[in-house]
Amino acid sequence: MSRPDESGYAPADGVEVYWESRGAGGTPLVLVHGGYGLTSDFDSLADSWSTDRRVIAIELEGHGHTRATGRPFRWETFGDSIAGVITHLGLGQVDLLGYSLGGGASLRCAIQYPGLVRRLVLICAPHRREAWFPEIRAAFDGMGADSLFDQLRHSPMFAAWQKVAPDPESFPPLIDATGDLLRQPYDWSAQVAGLAMPVMLIYADADSIPPAAAAEFFGLLGGGQRDANWDGSLRPASRLAVLPGRTHYDMLAAPALPEIVTAFTG
């Protein structure tokens, strides 16, 4: 895996958001990690995608290099932060990819700042809270440092986080803030139906979101409404992929993922 060509901090909605950049040319591709994630989660993928375009990975507030401000995490402010990085770096219109929690943040960015997003890729992210399986929503309801920190402190994820976090004591507050975010109700169905840019939805066949919810999301984007015609002329602009043999937690390692994203955003 290569080191980033550039890195820095972008002032965005009151947060100094950490970013890393690889490659040059083409439409920039912006990557947003999942919960408790880091830019390094995308290292292998960024190497693959940056051979002929610029790829920028960011860390949301309270994650990795990016300090928390102490305010509650909210989807809308995460969307503001992503837009702030895009604007600060002068990227113009980008292709935006978000995974899990980063998918929700990326969807909010596309809803709030549609002019900044040429194409949107969402991996393992639903359009409404009730689309998660009931047991996942129950886990969100109980998510907090008291219940999770002892489990996570011995994980490779925590070890990676400790190497880059500016405050080594800030992981428990991150768990609490993330749990609070994931307990908030949301349903963006109406806004999703109004999106003009093409959207690629990618899920695992053993995801934390049932296939029926993925199909519902796709339907809001104009997908699954009719036959595409023998020549594909009635194919919707948006796409849906369900990858076999994968779960919510290992999707970024799916061998098919790089080419699926390249084909959609190329």
What are these model-predicted stretches?
Residues 56-97:
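Active-site loop/oxyanion-hole signature of alpha/beta-hydrolase fold enzymes
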Residues 175-191:
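Active-site nucleophile elbow and catalytic-triad environment of alpha/beta-hydrolase enzymes
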Residues 195, 201-203:
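Short beta-strand/loop motif that positions the catalytic acidic residue
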Residues 208-216, 225:
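Conserved alpha/beta-hydrolase "acid-adjacent" motif
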Residues 241-255:
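Catalytic histidine-centered segment of alpha/beta-hydrolase-like enzymes
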